[in-house]
A protein has these predicted regions:
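N-terminal "domain-start" segment
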Residues: 1-94
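Acidic, proline/glycine-rich low-complexity IDRs
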Residues: 1-27, 35, 104-160
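Soluble extracytoplasmic regions of secretory-pathway and membrane proteins
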Residues: 76-105, 112-116, 126-128
């Protein structure tokens, strides 16, 4: 037979772990990656917000509220840094993909518009990671911007 105590423990571990946060929604533990996540609206578009379950929950939620209260400002800063760091690379990729055909240069504005926010990850110390779908700037790779609430966006790279 199967140990009933063990079965009870297993059943308990399968139950969803979640909590509600005003203004952000219901965070649910995603056990496969070890983080709490919710889907929120960022400038009218859906985006995942997540933080590692080992981080201080209250601090992470405070930092999410800080970002959410000034979405437009943070969005412009993060996209602006990504364009500053990656625009030349995007134009190199565009030239390569057209192999000799004349292609219009991608502008900073076009680059920023094509980025589609996928997720924001926050840490208890105020560090953050923004993950974007690339709008085919890099043939379907991700754009990853890291920084902190204190220093703003600092690094951007193409990944995946």
């Amino acid at each position: 037979g199967f140990d009933p105590d063990l079965k009870a423990i297993l059943e308990e571990q399968k139950k969803p772990v979640s909590f509600w946060e005003d203004g952000l929604g219901t965070f649910t533990l995603n056990r496969s990656v070890g983080w709490f996540e919710t889907e929120a609206e960022w400038l009218g578009q859906p985006a995942r917000l997540d933080f590692d379950r080992d981080e201080n929950r209250a601090d992470c939620l405070t930092h999410f509220h800080t970002l959410m209260e000034r979405q437009e400002e943070w969005d412009q800063r993060v996209r602006g840094l990504a364009a500053e760091k990656l625009l030349d690379l995007a134009n190199d990729w565009a030239q390569e993909s057209e192999e000799g055909r004349e292609t219009a240069e991608i502008t900073q504005e076009q680059f920023m518009e094509r980025m589609e926010l996928d997720a924001i990850q926050i840490y208890e110390d105020g560090a953050f990671e923004f993950w974007f779908n690339d709008g085919d700037l890099f043939w379907g790779h991700s754009i990853h911007v890291t920084g902190s609430l204190t220093n703003g966006p600092e690094e951007a790279q193409m990944e995946g």
